[in-house]
């Protein structure tokens, strides 16, 4: 439940960011101070983090990564599409396909990072763990033989 609450809270922050009108209110004045290029590319880490939170939330519910990752990535993309459509209905804001593409780039980067971490753990950590366990078993066997003598 905690992971779901964190993901929903984060989605609320992303939604709030989509409906801020530049120049109106305190948050709008802050938004007007941010350079345009930075604001455009801020979608990538925002939706990448959302995909990560959703994936981890599904994994906490015992979903394997092979199922959790595409479902979470799809949900993050649909949420990005929904916020872009809604943003277009807010006066002073506009929808932009480029923002949706940047959302997808962020989701793709997050998915790649999660998959590479899984592959790295299987390649690097698994052999090290197997070697440690085999040495531990040999050490246990040696100590057992010494005790019997």
Where are these regions (language model features)?
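Membrane-helix interface segments
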Residues: 1-3, 61-71, 93-97
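"…centered on the first transmembrane helix and the immediately adjacent amphipathic helix/loop
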Residues: 1-56, 139, 145-148
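Hydrophobic alpha-helical transmembrane segments
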Residues: 4-8, 45, 69-74, 100-104
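Small-polar-interrupted transmembrane alpha-helices in polytopic inner-membrane proteins
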Residues: 7-18, 68-88
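Interfacial helix-loop-helix junctions of multi-pass membrane proteins
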Residues: 24-31, 80-108
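Membrane interface segments of multi-pass transport proteins and intramembrane proteases
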Residues: 31-36, 59-67, 123-130
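Membrane-interfacial alpha-helical segments at the cytosolic side of multi-pass membrane proteins
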Residues: 45-61, 105-121
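Short, highly charged, low-complexity non-transmembrane loops/tails of multi-pass membrane proteins
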Residues: 125-145
């Amino acid at each position: 439940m905690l992971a779901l609450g964190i993901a929903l809270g984060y989605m609320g922050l992303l939604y709030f960011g989509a409906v801020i009108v530049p120049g109106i209110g305190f948050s709008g004045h802050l938004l007007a101070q941010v350079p345009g290029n930075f604001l455009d590319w801020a979608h990538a880490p925002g939706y990448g983090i959302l995909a990560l939170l959703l994936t981890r939330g599904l994994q906490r519910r015992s979903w394997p990564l092979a199922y959790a990752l595409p479902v979470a990535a799809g949900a993050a993309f649909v949420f990005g599409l929904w916020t872009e459509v809604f943003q277009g209905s807010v006066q002073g804001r506009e929808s932009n396909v480029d923002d949706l593409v940047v959302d997808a780039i962020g989701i793709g980067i997050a998915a790649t990072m999660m998959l590479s971490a899984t592959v790295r753990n299987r390649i690097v950590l698994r052999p090290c763990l197997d070697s440690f366990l085999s040495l531990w078993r040999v050490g246990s066997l040696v100590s057992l033989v010494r005790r019997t003598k």
